Amino acid sequence: MSIHAVTITELEHHNDRVMFFSVTKPAGFHFQPGQFVRCGVALVSDPKNEEDFLMRPYSIASHPQEDRISFYVARVLDGALTPKLFELKVGDTLYLDDTAYGLMLPSRLEAGGTLICFASGTGLSAFLSIVKDNPWKRFDNVVVVHCARCAKDITLADAFSKTVQQQGREVNFRFIAATTREPDPTLCGEINKRVPQAIIDGDFEKMGFTLTPQWVRAMICGNPAFVDSMKKVLKDRGFTAPRGEKLGTYVAENFW
């Protein structure tokens, strides 16, 4: 494995907690929508060895055919890396592994039905990449559920809307915001509780979804507690993960 120096070409702070940025794409770098790659900073002026870098895995938000690699990152106040990332600007140097990883891939799911992508926080990145790759060639409809604490952290809805419009798939797509700690009732998402609890309470059925493996395929990406809770409620409804070459009805990513 080698580490490439890349340049920040685009950077937008959505608020004091969340930012979206893009870097130059190294020659020969390949990935599949849904995968992640380690990205970070150098700890010394002339980095040569693995210990000279501070790297963390981030889901890729861009499409494989784009000439850039994009990320959606949340600040961790006591984190080692994200405070450094939030100090960067366009033109600065970051570092990227030469290999992408991850098995949260649409191709590991049975085809057909409605694909529901459940994301917490910046786990949403992977689903933007997937939606850019025309998932309707495999599924009838696509739904993205983004769970965040407050409405101000639901920041990529417009990016999804633009992507879907470019593909002419508005009638086959829905974005659902889920807020768990929004103090202003006028800003709450369609779901105003934790998503696993919303499933248990039948909220998705009230919105018109039959959340069973006969009709739905599910993808999960986010923090470990979210992923574990989602896996449990889906398993309780009969969803199964892929095993070997056998396709599943849900797939999850957890790279913490």
Task: Give residue ranges: language-model regions.
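A short, basic/flexible loop-to-alpha-helix module at the beginning of a structural domain
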Residues: A100-E110
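Conserved beta-strand elements of the Class I
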Residues: T114-F118
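Reductase modules of NAD(P)H-dependent flavoproteins
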Residues: S2, V145, C150-W256
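Ferredoxin-reductase
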Residues: S2-D92
